[in-house]
């Protein structure tokens, strides 16, 4: 039997964790209650599915004999792990150690209760029961004949790193009777409604059926498939959802011929959004960050053509649009450090191609944001906009704009380089990140950790293709740090020609 062991280190270098009990000392001579101190080697415990966890990583100090209880369960819906609330607890040990084999993949809250008859202390852990592909970077790529592969660069746990375990898997797509062909786009999401989780890792393709693969987020096993051939097209790009604890949970995507579709994560069916007022040029998810600890990041579907930007926030609200007469849309991006869903749209004048301006939506996204200024002694209400002129804009409609939770700037791609943009000024002339010579940028992503995750989205992933690279695989992954644009890691020659890259975050 395979076992995972956790052994206590020296007490002098351990992290102490103690919750104060009811210790009473009075001038009248009341007895002081016997204290308990719990020291643990780590606040996170990792174990693989089906592997027995043998945990001995504790130092407990008590002057009296102690009893123990270990219990685990999922974090209560609507709370965060730091609040230490369970949906339901299961006791797995009543001894000092754990000897237990878990049968369910996911991230759980683990609680230790220590009682010496006078005091009770608690220690909480994050318990990760891993499937093997729990967290990391997924790259969808195709060779010259359209044969697809799903490469996975695994984010290793501390224990896996110490053991030097493998973390690059060239192709993890394995579905009996299915061949991945002409992969186009990736998407991942999870939503819980009435204690039912709707989740999925989606793969869009341009195969003969226009297949969309709905994979299990924990194991990459096939859950179901849907076909776009009945609509005469295929999924070109995923982009957004409306899933704020609503039963009508779905992911939106753009077809190759510019139509808007929705994939239902529960039923697995595809429906066309027929009230879309125009053919779509691009689609992206407008992600915004909530301010409270339990707020979710909402990824609304945003899409635009040459003159109008649209959003569908919910099934009942329909599609809202904004445009600007006499101007055409160059590109658009979402501001992510605000609690509101502000979208910045870059326009170019139809009469003067050197004249540009950025306009901002209101927090409801239903109109342009406005401001009031004093002009000739009168208060005048006007739209918020940031004009500038340039004869050589380093951005076009093919540039992918990507925001993050830790910076008011966005990254975007142009001419095989990465630029930063504040969204309230002219885009820069000099790239923030230059890729190695010969690398052609195919897609970028951040380590977005999911709708309920805390902050910490601090990495940029760049999938590239170099036709001159030696060897069979000419696709690579470069990882950069947001804070200073420095290279963190590179994985060269690990895939074919990438079409999509995404961070596969941990999902329960």
PLM features per residue range, with description:
Residues 143-148, 196-197, 206-209, 218, ...:
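Short, solvent-exposed loop/turn segments at conserved positions within beta-propeller repeat blades
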Residues 384-397, 429-453, 486-500:
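Conserved blade-ending motifs and adjacent loop-strand segments that build the rim/top face
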Residues 4, 23-178, 452-457, 465-508:
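Acidic/polar, low-complexity intrinsically disordered N-terminal segments immediately downstream
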Residues 133-139, 199-202, 251, 343-345, ...:
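Entry beta-strands of beta-propeller and related beta-repeat scaffolds
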Residues 210-417, 421-422:
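Acidic, serine/threonine- and glycine-rich low-complexity intrinsically disordered segments
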Residues 150, 186, 191, 332, ...:
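Hydrophobic core register within WD40 beta-propeller blades
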Residues 1-10:
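Bacterial N-terminal signal peptides that target proteins for export
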């Amino acid at each position: 039997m395979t076992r995972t062991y956790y052994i206590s280190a020296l007490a002098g270098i351990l992290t102490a964790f103690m919750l104060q009990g009811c210790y009473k000392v009075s001038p009248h001579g009341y007895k002081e209650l016997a204290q308990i101190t719990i020291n643990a080697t780590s606040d996170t415990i990792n174990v693989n599915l089906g592997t027995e966890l043998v945990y001995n990583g504790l130092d407990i100090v008590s002057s009296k004999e102690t009893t123990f209880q270990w219990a685990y369960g999922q974090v209560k819906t609507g709370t965060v792990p730091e609040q230490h609330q369970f949906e339901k607890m299961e006791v797995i040990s009543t001894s000092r150690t754990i000897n237990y084999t878990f049968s369910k993949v996911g991230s759980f809250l683990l609680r230790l209760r220590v009682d010496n008859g006078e005091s009770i202390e608690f220690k909480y852990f994050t318990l990760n029961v891993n499937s093997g592909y729990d967290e990391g970077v997924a790259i969808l790529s195709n060779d010259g004949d359209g044969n697809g592969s799903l490469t996975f660069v695994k984010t290793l746990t501390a224990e896996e790193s110490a053991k030097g375990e493998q973390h690059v898997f060239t192709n993890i797509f394995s579905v009996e009777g299915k061949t991945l062909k002409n992969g186009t786009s990736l998407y991942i999401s999870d939503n819980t409604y009435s204690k039912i989780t709707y989740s999925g890792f989606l793969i869009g393709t341009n195969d003969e059926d226009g297949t969309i693969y709905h994979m299990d987020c924990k194991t990459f096993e096939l859950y179901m498939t849907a076909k776009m051939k009945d609509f005469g097209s295929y999924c070109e790009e995923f982009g957004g959802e409306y899933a704020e604890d609503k039963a009508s949970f779905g992911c939106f995507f753009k077809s190759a011929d510019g139509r808007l579709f929705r994939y239902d994560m529960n039923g697995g069916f595809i429906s066309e959004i027929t009230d879309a007022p125009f053919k779509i040029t691009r689609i992206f998810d407008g992600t915004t960050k909530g301010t409270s600890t339990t707020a979710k990041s909402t990824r609304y579907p945003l899409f635009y053509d040459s003159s109008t930007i649209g959003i569908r926030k919910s099934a009942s609200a329909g599609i809202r649009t904004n445009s600007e007469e006499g101007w055409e849309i160059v590109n658009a991006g979402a501001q992510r450090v605000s609690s509101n869903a502000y979208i910045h749209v870059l326009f170019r004048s139809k009469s003067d191609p050197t004249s540009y301006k950025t306009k901002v939506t209101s927090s409801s996204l239903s109109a342009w944001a406005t401001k009031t200024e004093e002009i000739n002694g009168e208060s005048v209400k006007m739209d918020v906009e940031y004009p500038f002129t340039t004869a050589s804009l380093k951005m076009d409609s093919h540039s992918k704009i990507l925001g993050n939770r830790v910076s008011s700037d966005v990254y975007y791609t142009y001419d095989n380089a990465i630029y930063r943009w504040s969204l309230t000024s002219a885009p820069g002339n000099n790239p923030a990140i230059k890729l190695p010579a010969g690398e052609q940028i195919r897609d970028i992503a951040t380590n977005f950790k999911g709708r309920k995750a805390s902050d910490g989205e601090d990495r940029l992933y760049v999938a590239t293709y170099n036709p001159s690279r030696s060897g069979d695989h000419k696709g690579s992954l470069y990882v950069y740090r947001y804070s200073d644009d420095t290279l963190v890691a590179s994985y060269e020659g690990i895939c074919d020609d990438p079409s999509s890259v995404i961070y596969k975050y941990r999902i329960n």
